[in-house]
């Protein structure tokens, strides 16, 4: 093979790694999605090794730019584990490479794996055998299988001659994304640098809170559910350095309970009940919840010590809070200049999926914002957000972020400098500094529960808002989700960001007919990305109506698709 600069050695290295971790003969097929590869931790060895190979080849393809591998299964039970590849921009693996990752993970034997790698390297013009440098940063969460699987990933990386594996330690998933992005931009990229940037930018935002907004309604006590995972541990490490907040961590990962078991953002958002680890002393206080690898964030308040129900603030309402804050700063800056032009013209994009609660979308539209919809999945939301000067997206589950384009940040820095020399301390100067600090605080690579939580706290203090003020932005419409088992989920074809059905013929008309029977009715169906079911989502003005609408539409799906 001409594409192998050190043919025999490279072949031998790949064959040896594949032989060490053969897939079980009856193993399930892997499919690389938003979550990467996931399964029971004990069965993940082969997929993790092969993901290491993919990451090393991706780095080689990109001229040696750092690529990341994180060992985590996020909000899944502790017995599970997984592997995700972080692309050089700090985002998710390029979708163009997902079929190759699938093919490699499912290669039945070492020879098949070798041939897949050789063909792909030839197609992508990747010179193997050490002529291209490659570097892969690796991290893991706190799962018991994590240490072993990280070692397996290192062996996969090392199977590509010339690739260097760097163990960054036990980290949150967003920390590794941040590190990869920062390293490739030539910025400081250690964990210490991450913490310094987050803490300093949060402190800056607190210093810019207007004196008249420093109201008594803001209690600085914040109770955080760490899901018994890495996010709780990291918060415990730095909470003493975070000014302006009295942080108490429950489910910190120091042995109080089991990872993600009856706690964490996924549990809180779906079950809408008090997580384990909270008691009567927490009633009425502002609470935040991370998921297992700290890339999701939701807030809640315990209503009563005699009731497990909570007041939930999900990703939709976090998005709404951030939108109000950012737009207010832009409005302050854009006091018209002498020519009637905007001082800082800004393309501000708000991105949601069909699963966003209709009340949140109505709220955003009613304050004059255009909402753009994408298909379900962070990779679609993130890609759309990148098109704007400021692009913000959140899923209801609490995963999301605010993206600032490099060009916009550069403009903002110049404007801040100009204000500093001509109008230091003016409202415009302070608003520009707030936006700059926000761009430093919120993770520019991926959703990050820790930095997102600090931005929430800074905005609440800026606005002088209590938790109740935040809750009162709007009232969520009741919703219901159902799954319908079908013979072939792919016989459903959707359009308009999965909000309408174009195949099979006639189904959308039936859905529209059902929706018309309910006040504030909304319903859509879409094929599941992971199992042979069709997912039904319905909203209406009451829980009973939402239930009825979902069931009626599910019956139509079942009748037509069997």
Swiss-Prot record:
Explain the purpose of this protein. Interconverts GlcNAc-6-P and GlcNAc-1-P.
Biological process per Gene Ontology, one example term? carbohydrate metabolic process
Q: Which Pfam families match?
A: AMG1_II (PF21405), AMG1_III (PF21404), PGM_PMM_I (PF02878), PGM_PMM_IV (PF00408)
Protein name listed in UniProt = Phosphoacetylglucosamine mutase
Which residues are recorded as binding substrate?
A: 395-397, 526-530, 535
Which pathway features in its UniProt record? Nucleotide-sugar biosynthesis; UDP-N-acetyl-alpha-D-glucosamine biosynthesis; N-acetyl-alpha-D-glucosamine 1-phosphate from alpha-D-glucosamine 6-phosphate (route I): step 2/2
What are its cofactors?
Answer: Mg(2+)
- Keyword Metal-binding recorded: yes
């Amino acid at each position: 093979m001409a594409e192998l600069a050190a043919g025999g050695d490279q072949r031998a290295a790949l064959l040896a790694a594949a032989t060490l971790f053969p897939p079980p003969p009856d193993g399930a097929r892997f499919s690389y999605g938003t979550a990467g590869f996931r399964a029971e931790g004990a069965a993940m060895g082969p997929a993790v090794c092969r993901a290491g190979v993919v990451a090393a080849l991706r780095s080689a393809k990109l001229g040696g730019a750092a690529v990341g591998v994180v060992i985590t299964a996020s909000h899944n039970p502790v017995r599970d584990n997984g592997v995700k590849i972080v692309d050089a921009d700090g985002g998710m693996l390029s979708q163009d490479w997902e079929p190759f990752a699938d093919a490699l993970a499912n290669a039945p034997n070492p020879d098949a794996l070798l041939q897949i790698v050789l063909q792909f390297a030839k197609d992508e013009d990747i010179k193997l055998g050490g002529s291209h440098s490659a570097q892969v940063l690796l991290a893991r969460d706190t799962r018991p299988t994590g240490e072993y699987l990280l070692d397996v990933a290192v062996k996969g990386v090392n199977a590509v001659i010339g690739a260097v594996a760097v163990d960054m330690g036990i980290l949150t998933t967003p920390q590794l994304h941040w590190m990869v992005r920062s390293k490739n931009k030539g910025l400081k990229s250690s964990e210490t640098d991450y913490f310094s940037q987050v803490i300093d930018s949060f402190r800056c935002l607190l210093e810019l809170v207007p004196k008249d907004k420093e109201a008594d309604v803001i209690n600085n006590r914040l109770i955080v559910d760490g899901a018994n995972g890495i996010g709780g541990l990291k918060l415990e490490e730095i909470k003493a350095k975070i000014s302006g907040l009295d942080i108490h961590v429950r489910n910190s990962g120091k042995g109080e309970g089991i990872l993600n078991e009856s706690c964490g953002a996924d549990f809180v958002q779906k079950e809408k009940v008090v997580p384990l680890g909270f008691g009567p002393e927490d009633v009425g206080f502002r609470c935040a919840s991370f998921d297992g690898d700290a890339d999701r964030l939701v807030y809640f308040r315990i209503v009563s010590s005699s009731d497990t129900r909570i007041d939930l603030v999900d990703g939709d309402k976090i998005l709404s809070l951030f939108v109000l804050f950012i737009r207010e700063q832009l409005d302050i800056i854009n006091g018209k200049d002498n020519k009637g032009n905007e001082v800082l013209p800004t393309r501000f994009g708000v991105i949601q999926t069909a699963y966003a609660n209709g009340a949140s979308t109505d709220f955003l539209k009613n304050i004059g914002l255009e909402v753009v919809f994408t298909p379900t999945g962070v990779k679609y939301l993130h890609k759309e957000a990148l098109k704007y000067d400021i692009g913000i997206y959140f899923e209801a589950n609490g995963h999301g972020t605010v993206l600032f384009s490099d060009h916009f940040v550069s403009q903002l820095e110049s404007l801040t400098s100009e204000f500093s020399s001509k109008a230091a301390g003016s409202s415009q100067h302070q608003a520009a500094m707030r936006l700059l600090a926000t761009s430093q605080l919120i993770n520019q690579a991926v959703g990050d529960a820790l930095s997102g939580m600090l931005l929430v706290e800074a905005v609440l203090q800026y606005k002088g808002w209590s938790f109740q003020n935040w809750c009162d932005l709007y009232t969520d419409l009741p919703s219901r989700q159902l799954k319908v088992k079908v013979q072939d989920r792919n016989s459903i074809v959707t359009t308009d960001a999965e909000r309408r059905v174009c195949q099979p013929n006639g189904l959308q008309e039936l859905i529209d007919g059902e929706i018309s029977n309910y006040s504030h009715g909304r319903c859509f169906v879409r094929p599941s990305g992971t199992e042979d079911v069709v997912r039904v989502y319905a909203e209406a003005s009451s829980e009973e109506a939402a239930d009825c609408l979902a069931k009626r539409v599910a019956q139509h799906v079942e009748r037509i698709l069997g």
